[in-house]
Amino acid sequence: MPWSPLAALSWALVLRLLALLWPPGRGEACSCAPAHPQQHVCHSALVIRAKISSEKVVPASEDPADTQKMIRYEIKQIKMFKGFEKAKDIQYVYTPFDSSLCGVKLETNSQKQYLLTGQILSDGKVFIHLCNYIEPWEDLSLVQRESLNHHYHQNCGCQITTCYAVPCTISAPDECLWTDWLLERKLYGYQAQHYVCMKHVDGICSWYRGHLHLRKEYVDIVQP
């Protein structure tokens, strides 16, 4: 299931929609709903590891009256984790030019590799923005790297609920509580880096790190 209706639109329409969501006068900030890395993988049409070769500012559409711009990143795809049925070798990814429209700034012509998650638009172009999970590969934990191959997308039937304050509880057996913000005051803390929400044969979901069950302090959060 795609992250949003953006996947069904052309890239020019996506940019116009973002412009409506963040009009001039609202400020320069890009606002995104919190999502665990597992949710990002599940909700993205494409997940790849890549290096950025170059960038170029291009028009958002062929309409001469359209003044919107996009950044086209030329990439070298290293590995694809998701999206095999929709794309093969990705050469370019596109993002809004303005950071206020959630445009992504990536390093070009360096040895840095990135994990890129994004959507494949109706015209076949790959669209990324700041609300996707985009991280330098070297910053990912071993558990995150391994989970990209199997565990994340094999457990998309689990729901991850962000916990902001105690008490917080689950409302269904297929939910996992994400407590990084509560315990560490940051989203991508220890739990996001080292745990996967996995479904048991009985349909119950819970956090696992490899073969180890969730540490007790995370479980205790649900108690009033």
Curated annotation (Swiss-Prot):
It is found in: Secreted. CDD domains: NTR_TIMP. Gene3D superfamilies: 2.40.50.120, Tissue inhibitor of metalloproteinase-1. Chain B, domain 1 (3.90.370.10). Pfam families: TIMP (PF00965). Residues 30-33, 99-100 are annotated as: Involved in metalloproteinase-binding. Disulfide bonds join 30-102, 32-131, 42-156, 158-205, 163-168, 176-197. InterPro entries: Netrin_domain, TIMP, TIMP-like_OB-fold, TIMP_C, TIMP_CS. The record marks 69 as: Involved in metalloproteinase-binding. Keywords: Disulfide bond, Metal-binding, Metalloenzyme inhibitor, Metalloprotease inhibitor, Protease inhibitor, Secreted, Signal, Zinc. Residues 1-29 form the signal peptide. Complexes with metalloproteinases (such as collagenases) and irreversibly inactivates them by binding to their catalytic zinc cofactor. Belongs to the protease inhibitor I35 (TIMP) family. This is Metalloproteinase inhibitor 4. The lineage of its organism: Eukaryota, Metazoa, Chordata, Craniata, Vertebrata. The gene is Timp4.
